[in-house]
Amino acid sequence: MDEDVLTTLKILIIGESGVGKSSLLLRFTDDTFDPELAATIGVDFKVKTISVDGNKAKLAIWDTAGQERFRTLTPSYYRGAQGVILVYDVTRRDTFVKLDNWLNELETYCTRNDIVKMLVGNKIDKENREVDRNEGLKFARKHSMLFIEASAKTCDGVQCAFEELVEKIIQTPGLWESESQNKGVKLSNKEEGHGGGACGGYCSML
């Protein structure tokens, strides 16, 4: 059934409670937005197949609770992940400041040294911004992460965040091949895509 799928990738979404992790996931997988969405209890899980540079990848996306009382679940959902999306709310500086804690947790429990990280500043549709875009970009560069600002509400930047993350994973030797039965798929080298298209001006490939 999935003969044309290059690989299955495990993607995590982490960050403080209320930053919009579930909203980003629902916008990406179902193209829906619910302003009254309840906080995630434990771990939610969705699957979506996307095509990047002509290669199909099935994403198993784990949406995690930000609350401290659910941290006992941590080791199991970090295990085997190839990509992680760290989310903060651009209107809440505290969620940006606490990114260091999430990075420390990632380093503690992640089983791969070459996991690809994407930093997402969410809720750019709101007026009361507390974290400047350049601050996010600087933090991402410091920690060798991809970076994008997004809005789950307006859909701005959401698709790009996931696509750029997957593209980087596929371009990283040894990160996913063991999961794909060595199908010998030839990867295309698409340099021009970073200058325009749907993702133009958003992502910084680091």
UniProtKB/Swiss-Prot annotation:
InterPro entries: P-loop_NTPase, Rab, Sigma_54_int_dom_ATP-bd_1, Small_GTP-bd, Small_GTPase. A lipid is attached at C203 (S-geranylgeranyl cysteine). Its EC number is 3.6.5.2. Regulated by guanine nucleotide exchange factors (GEFs) which promote the exchange of bound GDP for free GTP. Regulated by GTPase activating proteins (GAPs) which increase the GTP hydrolysis activity at the ER membrane. Inhibited by GDP dissociation inhibitors (GDIs) which prevent Rab-GDP dissociation. The keyword Magnesium applies. GTP binds at S17, G20, K21, S22, S23, D34, P35, T40, G66, K123, D125, A152. Residues 204-206 form a propeptide. A motif (Switch 1) lies at residues 31-45. SUPFAM superfamilies: P-loop containing nucleoside triphosphate hydrolases. The modification Cysteine methyl ester is found at C203. Its cofactor is Mg(2+). A motif (Switch 2) lies at residues 63-80. Disulfide bonds: none annotated. GO terms for cellular component: apical plasma membrane; cis-Golgi network membrane; endomembrane system; endoplasmic reticulum membrane; Golgi apparatus; lipid droplet. It catalyses: GTP + H2O = GDP + phosphate + H(+). Mg(2+) binds at S22, T40. A lipid is attached at C199 (S-palmitoyl cysteine). The keyword Protein transport applies. GO terms for biological process: brain development; eye development; intracellular protein transport; lipid droplet organization. It comes from the Eukaryota. It is found in: Endoplasmic reticulum membrane; Golgi apparatus, cis-Golgi network membrane; Lipid droplet; Apical cell membrane. PANTHER family: RAS-RELATED PROTEIN RAB. The small GTPases Rab are key regulators of intracellular membrane trafficking, from the formation of transport vesicles to their fusion with membranes. Rabs cycle between an inactive GDP-bound form and an active GTP-bound form that is able to recruit to membranes different sets of downstream effectors directly responsible for vesicle formation, movement, tethering and fusion. RAB18 is required for the localization of ZFYVE1 to lipid droplets and for its function in mediating the formation of endoplasmic reticulum-lipid droplets (ER-LD) contacts. Switch 1, switch 2 and the interswitch regions are characteristic of Rab GTPases and mediate the interactions with Rab downstream effectors. The switch regions undergo conformational changes upon nucleotide binding which drive interaction with specific sets of effector proteins, with most effectors only binding to GTP-bound Rab. Belongs to the small GTPase superfamily. Rab family. This is Ras-related protein Rab-18.
